[in-house]
Curated annotation (Swiss-Prot):
Catalyzes the transfer of the diacylglyceryl group from phosphatidylglycerol to the sulfhydryl group of the N-terminal cysteine of a prolipoprotein, the first step in the formation of mature lipoproteins. The keyword Transmembrane helix applies. It holds the Pfam family LGT. This is Phosphatidylglycerol--prolipoprotein diacylglyceryl transferase. Keywords: Cell membrane, Membrane, Transferase, Transmembrane, Transmembrane helix. GO terms for biological process: lipoprotein biosynthetic process. Belongs to the Lgt family. Its EC number is 2.5.1.145. GO terms for cellular component: plasma membrane. A 1,2-diacyl-sn-glycero-3-phospho-(1'-sn-glycerol) binds at residue 140. Signal peptide: none annotated.
């Protein structure tokens, strides 16, 4: 089954009173992923004794900082492209965002919101991170509609058809790579990997986390965040090796010859750092187990030490 993105990247496109009303598939999918992730997080929040409104209150801040972080991260490595017209940085319709930047933005929003709402940082992150990964899994389908995040040519039956105008050199040469050339759907690989990762995190939390019977609890607050970092980064590292439109230290596309794939470098660092943090978190826990306030407020009180 060949995967072939639609020619039109717009879900909605019309003019109202002379003003263009446009909704791209990419944006709609990102928003859908964020809302579904928030639904998951709100259910997890209730199970841990938090009020679900905390999730929805943080959502807008998370979206703003996530998108800003994704754009800033991308622009930082592609500044030569934007330098002639710096205002183009704000034109997101031209493409150019990076998942690692979005993750940084989401984590920053958690720091800000937990301080504002008086929530225990590490435990609240454990509530949210399965939702982060679920949003990433859904959001990757935006790459399908944008015809991006694809890999090397393949003869697999579920290869991805990419129109020539969306291909990076030399794959836009139709003499060597005809229109029928199929490419690895790396967006799909990462989407499936992330979805499996969501299942693993939920299983570990239910089996060994705070909601497990006391005798089975093995996870400290913050562990799910670090496991999320390891799971996501492990998949991203090997999938990134298949891509031909990677963000490289010296630009986008090709094999990154003479340079490095930024996502692979960040993934390696994240795996090591998260592994060390899990070790340290079990030597001396970063936070104690939160308890519910006796006044009926569902927001837990941290016993941090």
């Amino acid at each position: 089954m060949v995967l072939y993105p639609p020619d039109d990247p717009f879900l909605i496109s019309f003019t109202l009173f002379g003003l263009p009303i446009v909704v791209r598939w990419y944006g709609a999918i990102i928003m859908t992923g964020a809302l579904i992730a928030a639904l998951l997080a709100s259910r997890r929040a209730v199970a841990r004794g938090y009020h679900p409104d905390h999730v929805w209150n943080q959502l807008m801040l998370g979206l703003v900082l996530g998108i800003a972080g994704a754009r800033i991260y991308y622009v930082a490595f592609e500044w030569e492209r934007f330098a002639p017209n710096p205002w183009s940085v704000f034109n997101l319709t031209t493409g150019g965002i990076a998942i690692h930047g979005a993750i940084i933005g989401a984590l920053l929003s958690t720091v800000i919101y937990t301080r504002y709402a008086g929530l225990p940082y590490w435990d609240w992150l454990d509530v949210c991170v399965p939702g982060f990964l679920l949003a990433q899994s859904i959001g990757r389908w935006g790459n399908f509609f944008n015809q991006e995040a694809y890999g090397r040519p393949t003869d697999l039956p579920f290869g991805l058809r990419i129109d020539p105008e969306y291909r990076v050199p030399p794959y836009n040469d139709l003499t060597t790579y005809p229109i029928t050339t199929l490419f690895h759907p790396t967006f799909l690989y990462e989407s499936v990997w992330n979805l499996v990762g969501v299942g693993i995190l939920l299983w570990l939390d239910r089996r060994f986390g705070r909601l497990a019977p006391p005798e089975r609890r093995r996870l400290n607050p913050g562990d799910l965040l670090f496991l999320y970092g390891i799971i996501y980064s492990s998949g991203r590292f090997w999938i990134e090796g298949l891509r031909i439109d990677s963000l490289c230290a010296n630009g986008v596309g090709g094999s990154c010859e003479g340079s490095i794939r930024v996502a692979q470098l960040v993934s390696m660092v994240a795996i090591v750092v998260c592994g060390v943090l899990i070790f340290l978190n079990h030597r001396r826990p970063f936070a104690g187990t939160p308890t519910v306030r006796p006044d009926g407020d569902a927001s837990p009180v941290s016993e941090a030490r």
